Amino acid sequence: MFPILKRREPKRAVGWGDELIIRPDTPLNAAQKKQLAKAIKRAKRDGKIAATAQQTIPYEEMYENGVCRLGNRLYSKSIAFEDRSYAEASDDDKAVIFELYCRLVNYFGPTVAFQLSVVCYYPDMAEYRKILRIPPTGDSFDPIRKEFSDMLLTKASLCKTERSLCLTFTVEAEDVKQAASRLEQIQADVLERFKGIGTQAHGMDGYERLLLLHHCLHLDEPQRFKFNWDSLVGTGLSSKDYIAPSSFLFKEGRYFRVGPSVGAVSFLQIQATKLYDTLLNALLNIESSQIVSIHAKALDQGAALKTVKRKLSDLDKAKIDEQKRAVRSGFDMDILPPDLVTFGKEAEKLLEDLQNHDEKMFMVTILLVHTAPTKQKLENIIYSVNGIANANNCNLIRLDYQQEQG
């Protein structure tokens, strides 16, 4: 059989030129550190990196083990996982997968906030050409190697966007050592649950998290990620210097600008009594660079029960007021407004789930970030997304004058 060369890992560079090729974990000598620091300063001076862009990136320090210090005694870690073939599964398999995901979500208590993120970004085709190219060896199998390489590249070019999925969880701790211990335990438990679902997952190290942040900040302009841990020592550089875009502008209330692209942040207002599993899939199938993030935090069980019971008491009071009004008007007191009856049944079911089925109540926010080269194209994308949301009894609400916070 003819030999097929193994897939080559792309070289990860530092600096802004191709003359300094160093892997992320390669120690740098003093001359290389000096060269790198000069490259960063030159990029800042030329406007390739903006100081305000770094201030917008919401973390203080990223560590090699994947722990990120967010500030205010908060620390986070992320798990990358593969997409499960849920849509093609049978109804019975879907029910099992859904139940397992529910158990995963219920694992998180009120002291741990978590965020499910799906990042869709345009691939760097120049990098793919380097990776997929099989160099000739001078034998008779070179035409086959070229044909195979071209086929792989053609298939890669058919993919409009790449998709990365990660689960990020956040805890409060006194210092990074205490945070790392807690986060490692949570990571081990979550990975075990992903294994039960049948989904491949692994804890992300600091480089992987920075790479994903780099994708988030360069959705429309694929750029090679150039980074080295040793370059942060004794140079005054920060990991933000390597992932920051050329600029962030939030002067317009309904838009923001990141580098050459224009973007918008919206949240999903849920009005439906039940959300179907097709909603997220439909949102992600939009051919656009985007970030869909689901932020959730469980309420304390005691507080959740009090909230539901208080709501039931308010509904009972409203029923009594309606019955009194009906009697005074000469109507049948047993005829109540449909909304009161519906809300009462839903509240009773929720209380039953909380008390007897070990369910939890979560505070959930769903944010969507879309970017495009022009405002017109961005508005077309948002119009399509809003149509999907409306079909599921939801509304897409723009975060006016809160784009940076979003």
Spans of features found by a protein language model:
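Extended, folded cores of ATP/NTP-driven motor/assembly subunits in large transport
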Residues: F2, K34, K38-K41, G47-G406
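Compact, Lys/Arg-rich rRNA/RNP-binding cores from ribosome-related proteins
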Residues: M1-K48
